């Protein structure tokens, strides 16, 4: 039982630390650990996060981190994340495996897409291969792994419309973060792999690319119920040079931090907390 509580607490801490941008309060509910949580087809999520308007959620990063932890514990199933609208709130539910009776619990299941309109009693189910399938048409095959590209979700949630935008973030160059992670690793007594990709023209600025398809206009009979393009972000959101989603040195940091994690599992959360705060601190939004 103590091992179960420790694992549940660790998984919830990963969500709390990395799902949102630094400084953002996470409205998270954690389940009580018990045998039912680890059973195949369990309908009990490990945790539930209430999503709010105008935020970016690092879904693939957290999902892959969960996969690593569960593989280390020799857990036989892959986690499943479900974003659902029950009419009262939009929530992210994190399960250790696919729950039974998805349709009866979460209504109509929609596919991950660039733009998903999420009316009442609909959901988006995210499992092992969904992130790769989504990125296949957006990045080169060599960039499909989480070290080179990462899926994030931007929310647009109001009283009149609930919508999600799934975006792919690519780092142009990881060099800016290498020195930061090297300092962290030395402080913790780690010896991370110092190899990194070659730099581009913007390596000094550490800029990132956002790859996405254009928002589609509404068509009659569209299963997603898309009423048109998403509005621009609220006023005050800064626009990075060249447009796109600026997550400073994002994927370079993921690569460096994850390599440290694989080498020293029990210190990974300390490394990750500092490192993720570093690369997410420069996040900027554009409409």
UniProtKB/Swiss-Prot annotation:
It is found in: Host nucleus inner membrane. It is a single-pass membrane protein. Keywords: Host membrane, Host nucleus, Late protein, Membrane, Phosphoprotein, Transmembrane, Transmembrane helix. Residues 284-287 are nuclear. Its main location: host cell. Phosphorylated. Pfam families: Herpes_U34 (PF04541). Disulfide bonds: none annotated. The keyword Isomerase does not apply. The chain crosses the membrane at residues 265-283. Residues 191-244 are annotated as: Disordered. Residues 1-264 are perinuclear space. InterPro entries: Herpesvirus_viron_egress-type. One of its GO terms (cellular component) is host cell nuclear inner membrane. Residues 195-212 have a biased composition (Basic and acidic residues). Forms a heterohexameric complex with NEC1. Plays an essential role in virion nuclear egress, the first step of virion release from infected cell. Within the host nucleus, NEC1 interacts with the newly formed capsid through the vertexes and directs it to the inner nuclear membrane by associating with NEC2. Induces the budding of the capsid at the inner nuclear membrane as well as its envelopment into the perinuclear space. Belongs to the herpesviridae NEC2 protein family. This is Nuclear egress protein 2. The gene is NEC2.
């Amino acid at each position: 039982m103590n091992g179960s509580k420790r694992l549940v607490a660790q998984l919830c801490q990963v969500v709390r630390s990395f799902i949102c941008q630094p400084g953002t309060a996470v409205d998270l509910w954690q389940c009580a650990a018990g045998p039912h949580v680890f059973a195949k087809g369990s309908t009990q999520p490990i945790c539930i996060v209430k999503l709010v308007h105008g935020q970016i959620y690092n879904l693939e990063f957290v999902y892959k981190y969960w996969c690593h932890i569960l593989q280390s514990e020799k857990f036989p199933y892959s986690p499943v994340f479900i974003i659902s609208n029950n009419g009262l709130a939009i929530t992210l539910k994190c399960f250790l495996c696919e729950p039974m009776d998805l349709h009866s619990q979460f209504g109509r299941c929609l596919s991950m897409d660039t733009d998903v309109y999420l009316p009442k009693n609909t959901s988006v189910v995210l499992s092992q291969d969904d992130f790769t399938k989504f990125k296949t048409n957006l990045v080169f095959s060599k960039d499909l792994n989480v070290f080179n590209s990462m899926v994030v979700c931007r929310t647009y949630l109001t009283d009149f419309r609930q919508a999600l935008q799934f975006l792919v973030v690519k780092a142009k160059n990881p060099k800016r973060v290498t020195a930061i992670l090297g300092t962290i690793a030395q402080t913790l007594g780690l010896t991370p792999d110092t190899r990194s990709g070659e730099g581009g023209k913007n390596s000094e600025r550490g800029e990132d690319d956002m790859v996405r398809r254009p928002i589609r206009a509404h068509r009659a009979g569209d299963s997603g119920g898309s009423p048109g393009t998403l509005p621009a972000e609220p006023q005050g959101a800064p626009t990075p040079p060249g447009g796109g989603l600026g997550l400073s040195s994002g994927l370079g940091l993921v690569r460096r931090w994850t390599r440290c994690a694989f080498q020293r599992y029990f210190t990974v959360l300390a490394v990750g907390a500092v490192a993720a705060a570093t690369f997410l601190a420069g996040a900027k939004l554009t409409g």
